[in-house]
Design a protein with these regions (language model features):
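Physicochemical signature of membrane-embedded alpha-helices that form the seven-helix bundle of GPCRs
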Residues: 7-10, 47-50, 79-82, 106-113
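Short alpha-helical packing/oligomerization segments
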Residues: 64-86
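Interfacial loop-to-transmembrane junctions
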Residues: 89-117
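Juxtamembrane loop-transmembrane helix junctions in multi-pass integral membrane proteins
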Residues: 2, 42, 46-49, 71-74, ...
Length: 131
């Protein structure tokens, strides 16, 4: 059960680190609330990375935890790892490029991978529920 716990820890830490990044970017921009509309703005990118992570990471963490509570097939374990990697890739795809205005392969693969692995984990939990 170590791998699921590591995935959950990474996703949880990612959410908090990105939240801290938003706070730091707000301090630097001297903007206590709101979001700049410029997709090149570091605060805009920080907010989008954190907000998107806050949407998906908790659901993935719950699915990973529930799936880990039963005897699981190896594909379920690998799906947990890939889901976690996809979230990291997505965040990198937002924060690393100069602007969010252009399509980015890291962001695309991270998002698509999150959707696919999220559904796979939900199916695994559903199958577990059937007994």
């Amino acid at each position: 059960m170590t791998i699921p716990m590591i995935c959950i820890a990474i996703l949880g830490a990612l959410c908090f680190v990105l939240g801290l990044n938003v706070s730091a970017a707000r301090t630097k921009a001297k903007l206590g609330s709101g979001c700049p509309s410029d997709p090149k703005d570091p605060l805009h990118k920080a907010i989008r990375a954190h907000a998107n992570t806050a949407e998906y990471a908790p659901v993935l963490m719950i699915l990973i935890y529930i799936a880990s509570q039963a005897q699981m097939a190896s594909w379920v374990l690998w799906t947990m790892v890939v889901a976690t990697a996809c979230r990291l890739l997505f965040v990198a795809g937002i924060l690393l490029p100069r602007s969010m205005s252009r399509p980015n392969p890291m962001r695309f693969i991270g998002a698509l991978g999150t959707y696919i692995t999220g559904v796979m984990l939900a199916v695994a939990v559903f199958i577990q529920g059937l007994g």
